[in-house]
Design a protein with these regions (language model features):
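Non-catalytic substrate-recognition and accessory regions of acyl/acetyltransferase enzymes
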Residues: 2-145, 150-201
Length: 201
């Protein structure tokens, strides 16, 4: 009888295997650690993202329910999942979760980090909404020869037109989400971020 693989140590964090999801990342290790909207380390990475409107401002996460994930070493990465109230959504995808920021400053494949962040999101929040996950990409911020949002497309997202502001809209259907897998823990205690609901079930 095969023994269950033990979590591997990577720095100070315990790396847990991701359960197979049939969507392209089964068996990979979750590298994301749980952060929150008040974490200065996460804010520093957000300040370097092209969609940051007020660099240095304390707030880098939209109001409402959110999940902030961070990688600090050997190179930073940031992911923010947001579940806006459909009553206040102005785009044509009300009900969808939204990735409001993703930045990978390391050498990892961005598509793999995206799938791992999705796995951590469904672990925290439960099954995704029927509308799935949405993200917007500014085509003017990508290299001329690059496909806007290519790493998201590699992770299973599909193009769904444009926002009113001309951003490329990419959507991941609910059926394409990976199986849930918990993020790692780090020094910031996200339990005090009351908007990160359903983290402790």
């Amino acid at each position: 009888m095969a023994r269950r693989a033990r979590p591997r140590q990577r720095g100070a964090a315990v790396v847990r295997p991701v359960r197979g999801d049939g969507g392209g990342v089964g068996g990979a290790a979750v590298r994301w650690a749980l952060s929150n909207r008040a974490d200065p380390a996460a804010r520093a990475v957000a300040d370097r993202h092209y969609n940051r409107q007020h660099v240095g401002a304390d707030q880098f996460v939209p109001p409402g329910k959110c999940l902030v994930l961070l990688i600090e070493a050997p190179a930073p990465a940031l992911w923010i999942s947001h579940s806006p109230d459909p009553r206040f959504v102005k785009h044509r995808w009300p009900g969808a979760w939204v990735c409001t920021a993703f930045r990978n400053e390391g050498a990892w494949l961005s598509s793999e980090l995206i799938r791992e962040a999705l796995a951590a999101t469904v672990d925290a929040w439960g099954p995704p909404p029927a509308e799935g996950m949405l993200t917007f990409v500014d085509p003017t911020k990508t290299a001329p020869k690059e496909v806007p949002g290519w790493c998201f497309r590699r992770a299973g997202f599909k193009s769904d037109g444009f926002s009113e502001g001309g951003l490329v809209a990419l959507v991941l259907p609910a059926r394409r989400f990976p199986a849930p897998s918990p993020p790692l823990w780090r020094g910031v205690d996200a339990r005090w971020d009351t908007r990160q609901q359903r983290l402790f079930r």
